[in-house]
């Protein structure tokens, strides 16, 4: 037992055990601490795109919020109307509702669906706000979604057809914003909307009689 204790006392400590590895790393010209918890560097730079550019507001239609609330109300009303059809069918099968009332409920539900489709088609193309980037090359259109919420669409200014080439007149209730590519058409009203930056607006859509 005494011999074993003397052998343990003479053996190198834990600090000496790591010296060969330390010498190996140092001979390689590398710091061993670099390998502890290190990993490949991650780039924090975001890719450049329209979302990262600065835009200037050039047009605003203040009533777009009211149209958004109206769109949500119409979706809720249509959902309730359609949800009332299954109970109506059950009542008719049990003889609790005449056939004429069932037809009336079905007609109301069909009319509500048709109105929702028409209103959604128009509201999703109604322009609430127009922005132009500082270089004047990108047009950002803020409009509504099917659910009455805001959505931004980016269009190259070079693809936008000037309103001076459109058959629509500024005195009309709505004017169309069209693209040469034919991707999407929007509607804006100069009668009830406000042009906030006339210079940038005319750079995109041309000089209109209503803005002179």
Curated annotation (Swiss-Prot):
UniProt KW keywords: Membrane, Mitochondrion, Mitochondrion inner membrane, Transmembrane, Transmembrane helix
Coiled coil ranges: none
The UniProt entry lists the main location of this chain as mitochondrion
CC annotations in GO: mitochondrial inner membrane; mitochondrion
Topology: which residues are Mitochondrial matrix? 1-78, 123-212
Transmembrane helix is among the record's keywords = yes
Provide Mitochondrial intermembrane-side residue ranges: 100-101
The UniProt entry's GO biological process terms, in alphabetical order, are:
mitochondrial respiratory chain complex I assembly
Q: Where in the cell is it found?
A: Mitochondrion inner membrane
Top-level taxon in the UniProt lineage: Eukaryota
The record gives the membrane topology as: Multi-pass membrane protein
Any stretches that span the bilayer, and where are they?
A: 79-99, 102-122
What do we know about how this protein assembles, alone or with others? Part of the mitochondrial complex I assembly/MCIA complex that comprises at least the core subunits TMEM126B, NDUFAF1, ECSIT and ACAD9 and complement subunits such as COA1 and TMEM186. Interacts with MT-ND3.
Biological role stated in the UniProt entry = As part of the MCIA complex, required for efficient assembly of the mitochondrial complex I.
Indicate the family of this protein. Belongs to the TMEM186 family.
> Which PANTHER family does the record associate with it?
TRANSMEMBRANE PROTEIN 186 (PTHR13603:SF1)
This one is known as Transmembrane protein 186
Which organism's genome codes for this protein?
Answer: Bos taurus (Bovine)
**Which classification does the entry list for the species?**
Eukaryota, Metazoa, Chordata, Craniata, Vertebrata
UniProt gene name:
TMEM186
């Amino acid at each position: 037992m005494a011999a074993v204790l003397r052998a343990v006392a003479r053996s190198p400590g834990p600090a000496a055990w790591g010296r060969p590895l330390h010498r190996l790393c140092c001979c390689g010209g590398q710091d061993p601490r670099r390998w502890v918890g290190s990993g490949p560097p991650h780039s924090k730079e975001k890719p450049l795109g329209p979302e990262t550019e600065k835009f200037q507001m050039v047009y605003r239609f203040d009533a777009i919020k009211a149209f958004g609330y109206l769109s949500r109300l119409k979706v809720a009303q249509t959902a309730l109307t359609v949800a009332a059809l299954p109970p109506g069918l059950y009542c008719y099968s049990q003889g609790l509702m005449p056939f004429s009332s069932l037809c009336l409920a079905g007609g109301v539900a069909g009319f509500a669906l048709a109105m929702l489709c028409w209103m959604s088609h128009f509201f999703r193309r109604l322009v609430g706000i127009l922005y132009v980037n500082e270089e004047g090359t990108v047009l950002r259109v803020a409009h509504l979604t099917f659910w009455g919420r805001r959505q931004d669409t980016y269009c190259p200014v070079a693809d936008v057809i000037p309103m001076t080439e459109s058959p629509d007149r500024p005195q009309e209730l709505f004017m169309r914003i069209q693209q040469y590519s034919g991707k999407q058409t929007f509607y804006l009203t100069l009668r009830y909307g406000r042009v906030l930056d006339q210079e940038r607006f005319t750079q995109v859509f041309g000089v209109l009689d209503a803005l002179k």
